[in-house]
Regions:
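Phosphate/nucleotide-binding catalytic core
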Residues: 1-151
Length: 151
């Protein structure tokens, strides 16, 4: 687990992308570069020169388009979890929040997974999937973004 590499996409509302990028840049003591484009990207380098992004996510229901926010992390490792936690706490204290339309995506490096380990993981998730959906109370209209394994 401690050597596993992963990336996270965290959707949120409550602050603008500009404000979110400023919070991330201030956290790392850097600035941000506005990339623009369809996702209206703002790129922020951390002390390890990795790029964190604040982008637009049109699937998010927000008061204003500029509040459809998603934080995209660079590739992280276990030792980065405390940094991520502190950054998210800072963002929350400054107004970032989630609503029913916000999601979280975790991408895991599959390099060290054997074919059997992948089968085991999918089987485990599949066998507990209904419990997860019920526990999370996922609304039916959100299912297009969060489909079940067998759908």
């Amino acid at each position: 687990m401690k050597r596993l590499k992963f990336g996270i996409e965290i959707e949120f509302i409550g602050i603008t992308r500009e404000a979110a990028a400023t919070i991330v840049a201030d956290f790392f003591g850097t600035g941000f570069f506005y990339e623009g484009g369809e996702l209206k990207e703002r790129d922020i380098a951390d002390e390890k020169h990795r790029i964190w992004r604040v982008v637009r996510d049109a699937s998010i229901e927000a008061f204003a388009e500029e509040e459809q926010c998603e934080l995209v992390t660079p590739i992280l490792q276990y030792e980065d979890l405390e940094c991520l936690k502190q950054l998210l706490q800072n963002m929350q204290q400054l107004g970032a929040r989630v609503n029913r339309s916000c999601g979280l995506h975790i991408h895991v490096d599959g390099k060290n997974f054997t074919p059997q380990a992948i089968v085991n993981l999918v089987t485990l998730i599949g066998s507990r999937e209904l419990l997860l959906y019920k526990a999370l109370s996922i609304p039916k209209d959100r299912m297009k973004y969060c489909k079940r394994i067998n759908d």
